[in-house]
């Protein structure tokens, strides 16, 4: 399977999950983050083995040492990613917050409320833990 097909499948699944998460409770969203952290920790060895393959491929492709240093995952970096997911779960819930509210001259009450905006995709060269 080529990279474009894989990325398209992942993006489609992410979009579906984002719709589900947008209507989920705070507790459900926090649980997803905790499960992400748990899975990062549980699968650390597998992640590091896959990263080793990435590192070997990058070296073969002539990637600079500076970029290789940023691409490298260590157990500590994976654990830091897990901690980051747990830290996000501890933050105040950003959804449903009234950001601006005012009464208009015509009697209407205008509110700006924070809502989920969907999936953001990011392509990066290195630094998988950032």
What are these regions (language model features)?
Residues 1-109:
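N-terminal Rossmann-like NAD(P)+-binding subdomain of aldehyde/semialdehyde dehydrogenases
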């Amino acid at each position: 399977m080529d990279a474009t097909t894989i990325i398209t499948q992942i993006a489609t699944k992410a979009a579906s999950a984002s719709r589900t998460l947008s209507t989920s409770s705070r507790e459900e969203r926090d649980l997803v983050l905790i499960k992400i952290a748990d899975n990062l920790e549980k699968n650390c060895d597998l992640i590091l083995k896959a990263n080793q393959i990435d590192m070997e491929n990058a070296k073969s492709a002539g990637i600079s040492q500076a970029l290789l240093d940023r691409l490298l995952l260590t157990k500590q970096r994976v654990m830091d990613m897990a901690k980051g997911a747990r830290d996000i779960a501890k933050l105040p819930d950003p959804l449903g917050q009234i950001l601006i509210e005012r009464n208009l001259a015509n009697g209407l009450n205008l509110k700006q409320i924070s809502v989920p905006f969907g999936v953001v995709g990011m392509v990066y060269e290195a630094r998988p833990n950032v």
